[in-house]
């Protein structure tokens, strides 16, 4: 799992229940980020390590996350991502490196009244159950770094499943960041 840490923490808003959920296609990059998302954030990752996160706009409805451990501020990693809004939830999406299938990952997020950015991973077991019960189409995969599942359903079916309040337990809090300075 350690090899995924950089990718997953950087997108820690993207995944870290310890396993990877990927999708064949990304949500369309048609939504601008909600007010307050861009800027500098700090938090503690799943391993108790202090982290910093900077979110910036890099193009039309395209963004970049730059992450680093506070103990190693010179070791920064940048990851492009997009934002979309479906139902009552905001989503982040990013391309997964080729060694993990090269598809896309999706995570939920919210901005709280307490100036926090809360990121939700998709629970691997819940997604596997959805596939077994035919609510979603997909297949399990494994890499040297751990288990994963690739969801093959089209995005309409994916978001119908994710937006259904009955499936809210598919989202697991991955990380909670606090705003470092004023929102953009």
Where are these regions (language model features)?
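Bacterial N-terminal signal peptides that target proteins for export
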Residues: 1-8
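C-terminal motif of bacterial Sec signal peptides marking the signal peptidase cleavage site
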Residues: 15-18
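Calycin-type beta-barrel ligand-binding domains and close structural analogs
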Residues: 20-36, 44-51, 56-58, 62-184
